[in-house]
Design a protein with these regions (language model features):
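N-terminal small-residue-enriched
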Residues: 1-476
């Protein structure tokens, strides 16, 4: 491991430039027209606490190289965690053997790309004692557990990762990046007889241990406890078709899942998305502008470059209801005859990259949350969203409402639980009739064909004129 880093002109690199060049040329030896190396060296810590006791603490390191080759629209991918010269050349040649043809390149001149740094880090987690990390977890546990006697279980997780990457390709790109992320997870369980309800909060940022100077650990833990306790004492949500107000922050998970994946070139290029071929068409209410922006400083889903080495950027997906763009990676960009948008991501070197979201959100509108509620005769107010499922080809979704309330005559009447939102993403976009100005985001992990990656989801409070709500009670 000590030999991973090599001093090249301009500093230390994960691989020597001469080796990078030789591996790329080997990968192209059978007619490939593009080859890429992705190397990473990642360290991380994961600590789990249950009811104030540390159950597990793991620190580890993972490193390896992924080699990808294109020939037209074909793609071959291979990876290894043996980074010595002989093995890397062997893996490159084995991957190349899947293709046939004469070499198209015999020489590559690598040009170092200097990237803008959107995500400064002040306190590297590796330099912070484990006792300090556990101390943060204990504070969260005490705040949640002490909120009320109905809180019967509190689970806390702490996570930090420090990923170094090197990306080089046959177009001459050579770039390195470092991504440090820190996150706290709080899950509170409230009990009432045989009934149990849980609530989760998971603040995280693309930053170091200074995260805990930016968030109020105790207040977040208390909010999780409050939500769980409110829901265990709540009545069941009524079923039917009626307006739904979806609150800001993690409410954006519906757009992310039901619409965002359909705007990734992975599905668009195959015609497997309801948004395929609709650039320039109205796909949402004129109140809706939606963006994917990987450049927001220190946001959970931000990166200086994507996992193909393209600089991240602000991608406007929908503007005033009109479809303006997609999230595009290199391979699907070829298929669509469109340029990459800095949207290609992967969990690790073990995955070939593809188009994925970074920080995706519906932009702020002109109303206030209070105006939306006061102007609504009857609705379900979804304050926090839970898990769900989506068919990416159709945008059909099914999402649990983790914390809900009935709005009646312009006022929040009572809490309700067990509600489920059922619909089709593109139809819901058309039915958004009020958008507040209180844009906020929540953090999550998004799973897809290139693995699990950190993403921000966000929106202001919005009102949808009608959604099918699944519940245990008849309509009120």
């Amino acid at each position: 491991i000590q030999q991973l880093y090599h001093r090249n002109e301009g500093g230390f690199y994960l691989l020597a430039e001469s080796l990078v060049t030789d591996v790329i040329l080997a990968a192209l030896s059978t007619g490939g027209d593009f080859a890429e190396i992705f190397m990473e060296d990642t360290r991380g810590t994961n600590i789990r606490m249950l009811n104030g006791s540390v159950e597990e603490g793991v620190s580890g390191r993972d490193y390896g190289v992924g080699i990808r080759i294109f020939q037209g629209f074909r793609s071959v991918y291979a990876y290894t965690n043996d980074t010595n010269r002989e093995n890397l050349l062997k893996v490159a040649l084995e991957a190349a053997a899947a293709l046939s043809g004469a070499p198209q390149l015999t020489n590559i001149v690598l040009q170092r790309l200097v990237v803008d740094r959107f995500n400064p880090v002040r306190l590297e987690p590796q330099d912070v004692p484990h006792s300090d990390k556990v101390g943060i977890m204990k504070r969260a546990n005490l705040a949640a557990a002490g909120y009320d006697k109905q809180i019967t279980q509190v689970a806390i997780t702490y996570l930090d990762t420090d990923q170094h990457v090197l990306i080089a390709n046959s177009e001459g790109l050579l770039v390195q990046d470092r991504r440090i992320r820190t996150r706290l997870g709080i899950n509170a369980v409230a009990s009432k007889g045989n009934e149990k309800q849980s609530a989760f909060r998971g603040p995280g940022r693309h930053m170091g241990f200074e995260l805990f100077e930016h968030i109020d650990v105790e207040e977040i833990a208390k909010d999780a406890a409050r939500s769980a306790m409110t829901m265990v004492n709540a009545d069941y949500a009524p079923s039917g078709k009626y307006p739904v107000i979806i609150d800001n922050e993690f409410g954006g998970v519906i757009f992310h899942e039901a619409c965002g994946h359909g705007l990734e070139a992975t599905s668009v290029a195959k015609g497997a998305s309801v948004f395929s071929g609709k650039l320039g068409q109205q796909v949402a209410s004129s109140l809706v502008t939606a963006v994917d922006d990987g450049t927001i400083p220190n946001a959970w889903g931000s990166q200086n470059i994507d996992d193909e080495g393209t600089k991240t950027r602000r991608n406007v997906l929908i503007e005033n209801g009109i479809l303006k763009g997609y999230m595009i990676d290199k391979l699907n960009g070829r298929r669509m005859e469109m340029e990459p948008t800095g949207s290609s991501r992967r969990q690790s070197y073990k995955f070939a990259p593809t188009s994925r979201m970074t920080n995706t959100f519906i932009c702020a509108g002109q109303s206030t949350k209070e105006e939306i509620i006061s102007n609504t005769e009857y609705a379900l107010f979804a304050k926090h969203m839970g898990g769900g499922s989506v068919n990416p080809a159709t945008g059909e979704f099914n999402f649990a409402v983790a914390e809900g309330y009935i709005v009646r005559n312009g006022k929040i009447e009572k809490p309700v639980r067990g509600g489920t939102l059922i619909g089709q993403g593109s139809q819901i976009l058309q039915k958004i009739d009020m958008v507040a100005s209180n844009l906020a985001s929540g953090q999550g992990m998004c799973g897809s064909r290139s693995g699990s990656i950190p993403t921000d989801v966000g929106q202001p409070t919005i009102r949808v004129s009608e959604i099918t709500v699944g519940g245990r009670k008849g309509a009120n």
